[in-house]
Design a protein with these regions (language model features):
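Beta-strand cores of secreted/periplasmic/IMS beta-sandwich domains, seen most often
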Residues: 1-35, 42-112, 119-131, 137-152, ...
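Generic domain-boundary/flexible-linker signal
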Residues: 15, 38, 65, 113, ...
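Active-site pocket scaffolds in enzymes
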Residues: 19-52, 228-248, 293-294, 298-311, ...
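Histidine- and aromatic-rich segments of cupredoxin/plastocyanin-like copper-binding domains
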Residues: 31-63, 160-338, 447-449
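General secondary-structure edge motif
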Residues: 81-82, 100, 187, 235, ...
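Generic secondary-structure boundary/loop-capping signal
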Residues: 109-110, 117, 160-161, 183-185, ...
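Low-complexity, Pro/Ser/Thr- and charge-rich linker/hinge segments at domain boundaries
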Residues: 125-152, 317-331, 504-521
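An extended, acidic, His-containing surface patch that forms the Zn2+-binding/catalytic region
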Residues: 338-345
Length: 555
């Protein structure tokens, strides 16, 4: 477990903060399997001069019902000395590439854009980031050998985002645009048009789409513009059952991640390769078109986000990050690539009959009041902005963000539900993100399932206009308040977010005992916290007589 203490040292004066963003903060561990109090989206924000302790458990999901005696060596973590620490839970729920970012309701996009964001990796017995250790569990994916685990010399995080600047070189953001924000500068790890030196061997790249409203369609090409295939091994931080070799990666929407293996061995020192973005945008509503590689390289678009985004330069020597002072030599025997990419990476979680189904429609417009004087907003809405987005459950009224409203209630851990995520249309795309748990994609409409999506665990699902995605979710041992929302964070801040709660089992000692019933919602202020009992929508709770466990949808 990790305690992450977040101090808020933001300037108290809003004028000192660039004209946008919130001085109150909260941090969400994206894809973390944590208690709701440490999820970062339970309305527990805090103010300048305050701090908040997040307890990131790093436990495996299903610890309350699978491998409870921790006998499966695949459900494990490295001990730092070449051995394993066994833990309860399902090894198929192991996590790898995660990230953290601000999640202050109504201000997420702005705070993340200003820099409240970062990537982090979870290491496990199967994926310990040591390519030499052979213990029958470790996959030996490209990473390095200097450390027992967590080698990063050949295992590299890449965060893709976009930005715009004003005439003074400061970040520009339009707080009144609720469709979506596009920058004219494409950044990789906050650098504009960077290059990266690599040795002629295999690398693992953990890629994150961290833009507010721009997604990416990436391909690797050589100096002649010819495509170089890559292997996809993980999506949304989760190993896929088998590696998939592709010429172009699946679309990476906001919040999505792809781990890919690139083998630079066929190239010689001095060669250069390029990651190219093919996805063209005209505005923040969604992609306009996917360009061919040749058109993207020739600049046949007005979108400055299309084209080369990262250059790889093949080099013989490279300084180690894991062992400062050591310099690799690609011609030295001790520095040869010892990694592998196994044909099987993990086991697919099977699709089973659900206890209930839900239809969750992401759409324009809402039927509820947005006037804070009648409790329409919780926490208080930004008075100067529109909040045109909402979510509808099972075809009932459309509601917009209210942290004190439970739109869906899961009555006990361990239950399996099937959700149909539906784009209500109108010309917008929506990447839907589920907090706390992950789902397995069952089917799609609107466009075909991506090569890396089939059988994989995910936490973000991109829906094109009018499209839908059906997923399977099993809810775990923690309880409390979580959310699901559009990860076009401009849409999210304009109220396209709902709260769902999980109740825990008081008779199971392996589950959290803190949320056996619905508890009050915190309402923080600079001077303290008050608590209010939440509203529960009847269409979202199985305890209500009008609840429909298997609603019908035309999709």
């Amino acid at each position: 477990p990790v305690i992450f203490r977040h101090y808020n040292n933001v300037a108290l004066s809003q004028e000192q903060n660039g004209g946008f963003g919130s001085i109150s903060q909260t941090t969400h561990n994206h894809n973390g399997h944590n208690a709701s109090t440490s999820d970062g989206a339970s309305n527990a924000h805090f103010y300048p001069g305050q701090f908040y302790d997040y307890h990131w458990s790093t436990t495996l999901a299903r610890a309350d019902m699978t491998n409870t005696q921790a006998t499966d060596p695949r459900a494990s973590g490295p001990d730092g000395n070449g051995r394993l620490v066994h833990v309860p839970g399902d090894y198929r729920e192991l996590q790898g590439t995660l990230w953290f970012h601000d999640h202050r309701f109504f201000y997420t996009a702005e705070n993340v854009y200003k820099g409240h964001v970062g990537m982090m990796n979870y290491y496990s017995g199967k994926d310990r980031a040591n390519e030499a250790l052979q213990d029958g569990v470790n996959l030996r994916l490209p990473s390095g050998t200097m450390l027992d685990y967590g080698n990063t010399d050949f295992d590299v995080n890449l965060m893709f985002s976009d930005a715009a600047s004003d005439p003074d070189g400061q970040l520009f953001f339009d707080i009144f645009d609720t469709e979506g924000f596009l920058g004219d500068m494409l950044l990789v790890n906050f650098a504009y048009k960077p290059f990266f030196e690599v040795m002629p061997r295999k690398y693992r790249f953990r890629m994150l789409g961290a833009s507010m409203s721009r997604w990416y369609k990436l391909a690797l090409v050589n100096q002649a513009g010819k495509v170089v295939p890559v292997q996809v091994i993980a999506t949304d931080g989760n190993l896929i059952p088998r590696p998939v070799t592709v010429n172009q990666m699946d679309t990476m929407a906001s919040g999505e991640r792809f781990d890919v293996i690139i083998d630079f061995k066929p190239f010689k020192v001095g060669d250069r390769l390029y990651l190219v973005n093919l996805m063209e945008f005209e505005d923040g509503r969604g992609p306009k078109d996917k360009l061919s590689i040749s058109d993207a390289l020739r600049g046949k678009t007005l979108d400055p986000g299309v084209g080369r985004v990262l250059e790889f330069r093949i080099t013989r020597h490279m300084a180690s990050v894991d062992m400062p002072g050591y310099v690799y030599d690609s011609q030295r025997a001790a520095d040869q690539d010892r990694s592998q990419v196994p044909a099987v990476l993990t086991e697919q979680i099977p699709i089973v009959a659900p206890v209930r189904e839900r239809i969750i429609e992401f759409k324009r417009g809402a039927d509820d009041a947005r006037d804070a004087t009648v409790n329409g907003c919780f926490p208080s809405c930004p008075a100067e902005r529109e909040t045109p987005w909402g979510i509808r459950i099972n075809g009932e009224d459309t509601h917009s963000l209210n942290a004190n409203r439970i739109s869906m209630l899961v009555p006990r851990p361990g239950e399996v539900e099937h959700w149909t995520l539906l784009n209500g249309g109108g010309g917008w795309d929506h990447p839907a993100h589920l907090h706390f748990e992950e789902g397995v994609t069952i089917s799609r409409t609107g466009f075909a399932m991506g090569a890396a999506e089939r059988g994989a665990r995910k936490d973000v699902w991109w829906m094109g206009e009018g499209g839908s995605v059906k997923i399977q979710v099993r809810f775990g041992e923690y309880g409390g308040a979580y959310v699901t929302h559009c990860h076009n964070t401009v849409h999210e801040d304009a109220a396209m977010l709902l709260r769902y709660d999980i109740l825990t089992d008081p008779n199971n000692p392996n589950t959290s005992q803190t949320h056996v019933q619905v508890i009050p919602t915190p309402n923080p202020t600079p001077d303290g916290v008050t608590y209010v009992m939440p509203e529960i929508l009847p269409e979202g709770t199985p305890f209500h007589r009008s609840f429909r466990p298997f609603p019908r949808t035309s999709t």
